[in-house]
Amino acid sequence: MKFFIDTANLDEILAAAELGVLDGVTTNPSLIAKIVGDPSNFTYNDFKAHIARICEIVDGPVSAEVTCLTAEEMIAEGEDLAAIHENVVVKCPLTIDGLKAIQHFSLNGIRTNATLVFSPNQALLAAKAGADYVSPFVGRLDDISTDGMELVKQIVTIYNNYGYPTEVIVASVRHPQHVVTAAMMGADIATIPYSVIKQLANHPLTDAGLKKFMDDAAVMKK
């Protein structure tokens, strides 16, 4: 399983990269907004420069999302984003216009990530349109009392049934169990907030055992 970090924060990306477990990055307009403070002072060129800096840190796919609604606008913006760096993956929402844009990008050698996916039928359409990645949002489904991980299971089964090469990125991850369950289901990737990456490494018995070892070592050194 591959781990992406779901953030636009450069410090978090650097910290995750230092752990040796990072395979890529996903961003979206909301994550960008968290780091800029006043969005009115953050231009589109600033956004592109920020994506370029992320690409310098991580040698892997970096998803950058289009911020428009029509296929024509998505294609124009997506081509501009793809020109930033060879590792840029263009994120398109799973809408009718998004599918048109995904097909265009697929035919022209630009990698895509179909985002805001909440049903297996949407994921099936994404694969048929040629998306390289599909991002089911499990946490948001959990928020409305729907089993987000069941969606991941359905998508993995459908893709395996037909041999679709589209990789499943489990997104909107809220806690370590989302990651573990996704891995058990055979999802290709989990894109994880830095806070959850740290939680994956923590266990109270590890902390207790380490304290005991250190206490015993301190006695022996006396």
From Swiss-Prot:
CDD domains cross-referenced by the UniProt entry: Transaldolase_FSA (cd00956)
Enzyme class: transferase
Pathway the protein acts in: Carbohydrate degradation; pentose phosphate pathway; D-glyceraldehyde 3-phosphate and beta-D-fructose 6-phosphate from D-ribose 5-phosphate and D-xylulose 5-phosphate (non-oxidative stage): step 2/3
Cellular localisation: Cytoplasm
Major localization listed first in the record, in broad terms: cytoplasm
Function: Transaldolase is important for the balance of metabolites in the pentose-phosphate pathway.
Name listed for the protein in its UniProt record: Probable transaldolase
